[in-house]
Amino acid sequence: MKLIAFDLDGTLTQHKTPLTAGNRAFLSLLSDRYRLLMVGAGDCQRISSQMGYFPIEILGNYGMQYARVSETGELRILREECVPCDHKKITATVDVLRRRFGFTSYRGDSALFFRSGCACFPVLGTEATLEEKLAFDPDRSRRRALLPEVRAAFPDYEVFVGGASSFDLSPRPYNKYYALARFCRDNGVALSDVLYVGDDPGEGGNDQPVYSAGVEFVSIDDYRKLPEKLAFLLPLPTGSAI
């Protein structure tokens, strides 16, 4: 194993909350032995900030951005790709879906857009509280049931069950497997030497393309148990029983 790639929310952290001291310390131990990479749906700035500028490489917006955070905590965007995005058309489509699904009550904006061309359908709106988001669809079953209709409404986009209460839209062909495979080609790393760590390999999850491609995968069901789930990657302390 040469490269360990990570999802963020639900894997290393709670949804949009800072990286804990324990998981940060564990990542530091892993970084002494492996190359580490974040593969995220959000942009590199958001990911690096949430991680407290932990030194790591980052693929943001499903691979549309590539950045590094230095040992001193400096974020450098090394590649950024953008595609045109019709905000009016996407917002109108989201509004149609809201009426169809009964999601007409929301706080903030009905849709969220990123400079890259990625977009988001935040079911509860852009200003919903974290508590509201976490309570909305904890097992993702509500959104999975609606996923075929949402995908049909956005044929030019990859559509995923994203975050705690949203649907992510990324311009085709950008998804986490596309991003990871491209990174590996550019850096001379075989996919057979990659371990991916994520929390949602199921239908519609944004980790699913990586899982379905056969990349070695460790599924995390509680970010607080990350060190326990990945302990096999580190040598036993001297004197430990086998």
Question: Which residues does each predicted region cover?
Answer:
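Hydrophobic "anchor" residues on beta-strands that sit immediately upstream
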Residues: 3-5, 57, 195
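Asp-based, Mg2+/Mn2+-dependent phosphohydrolase catalytic module
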Residues: 187-191, 204-242
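Active-site phosphate-binding/coordination module
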Residues: 17-109
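Non-catalytic pre-domain segments flanking phosphatase-related domains
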Residues: 1-6, 22-25, 29, 239-242
